[in-house]
């Protein structure tokens, strides 16, 4: 009869094995849940009353199937003038400014032994409010750039900075966000008021194909005249003035060497007072 009974030791061994297996499975599930790998980056919200969504970090502008758009509708983001960053590639997917990984040494005070170390930028993942888009934009941003955004008055003002240093700080991702907010009616109206203040005519559809160099040259001429207090001249007035100078140079003959002769001419001897 004793051969048919199960020993208590075997029962304890079986129970211990089951508990260990269950605990291991739970730990594996927790490790999978705590993984740092992100499947989707920057899931941006939809922009209200607009068919153009916020672009992805990869540079593509997704158009959902439910969005009614024409067949010939094509979105092309202008290429970033400074190209992708070759150092610290992570900065291509966020607003990092000019931040890089800094390398240095830890020096012992007792025996001056040096050990290599590095300082990484303080990168945060934030939801920044865009006034022109009317939504929160998800992006990685450093604390130094956050300070600059607060100083200039918001995300839109930071992205619309026109100086070369600001454009370099934006990086490829900031350049795409800059392009997106420039498509909003609020920013277009703002640019139209700036053109009117500079004395430039309102922008027409045929002016869309004008090269960037011509537009910058036109703004530069009007801006210099506006800074000097003169009345800014329109494009037609500048063209008429150029034609008039060309015709004048063809009809009149300029005397060469007259100024040099006057420069070398001796002054008459002063007369003595009686």
From Swiss-Prot:
Keywords: Mitochondrion, Ribonucleoprotein, Ribosomal protein. Residues 249-274 are annotated as: Disordered. GO terms for cellular component: mitochondrial large ribosomal subunit. It is found in: Mitochondrion. Its main location: mitochondrion. It holds the Pfam family Ribosomal_L28. SUPFAM superfamilies: L28p-like (SSF143800). InterPro entries: Ribosomal_bL28, Ribosomal_bL28/bL31-like_sf, Ribosomal_bL28_sf. Residues 262-274 have a biased composition (Basic and acidic residues). Belongs to the bacterial ribosomal protein bL28 family. Component of the mitochondrial ribosome (mitoribosome), a dedicated translation machinery responsible for the synthesis of mitochondrial genome-encoded proteins, including at least some of the essential transmembrane subunits of the mitochondrial respiratory chain. The mitoribosomes are attached to the mitochondrial inner membrane and translation products are cotranslationally integrated into the membrane. Component of the mitochondrial large ribosomal subunit (mt-LSU). Mature N.crassa 74S mitochondrial ribosomes consist of a small (37S) and a large (54S) subunit. The 37S small subunit contains a 16S ribosomal RNA (16S mt-rRNA) and 32 different proteins. The 54S large subunit contains a 23S rRNA (23S mt-rRNA) and 42 different proteins. This is Large ribosomal subunit protein bL28m. It comes from Neurospora crassa (strain ATCC 24698 / 74-OR23-1A / CBS 708.71 / DSM 1257 / FGSC 987). The gene is mrpl24.
């Amino acid at each position: 009869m004793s051969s048919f009974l199960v020993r208590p030791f075997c029962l304890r061994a079986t129970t211990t094995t089951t508990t260990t297996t269950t605990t291991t499975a739970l730990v594996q599930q927790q490790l999978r849940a705590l993984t740092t790998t992100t499947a989707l980056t920057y899931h941006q919200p939809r922009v209200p009353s607009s068919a153009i969504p916020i672009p992805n970090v990869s540079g593509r502008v997704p158009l959902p199937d439910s969005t009614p758009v024409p067949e010939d509708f094509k979105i092309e983001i202008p290429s970033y003038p400074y190209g992708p960053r070759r150092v610290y590639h992570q900065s291509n997917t966020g607003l990092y400014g000019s931040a890089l990984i800094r390398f240095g040494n830890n020096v012992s005070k007792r025996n001056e032994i040096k050990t290599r170390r590095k300082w990484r930028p303080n990168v945060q993942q934030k939801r920044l409010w865009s006034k022109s888009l009317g939504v929160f934009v998800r992006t990685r941003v450093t604390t130094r750039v956050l300070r600059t955004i607060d100083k200039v008055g918001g995300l839109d003002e930071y992205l619309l900075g026109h100086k070369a240093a600001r454009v370099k700080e934006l990086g490829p991702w900031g350049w795409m966000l800059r392009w997106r907010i420039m498509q909003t009616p609020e920013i277009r109206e703002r640019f139209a008021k700036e053109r009117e203040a500079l004395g430039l005519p309102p922008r027409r559809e045929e002016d869309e194909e004008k090269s960037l160099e011509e537009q910058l040259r036109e703004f530069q001429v009007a801006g210099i005249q506006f800074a000097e207090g003169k009345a800014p001249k329109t494009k037609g007035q500048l063209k008429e003035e150029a034609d008039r100078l060309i015709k004048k140079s063809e009809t009149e003959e300029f005397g060469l060497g007259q100024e040099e002769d006057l420069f070398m001419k001796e002054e008459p001897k002063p007369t003595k007072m009686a």
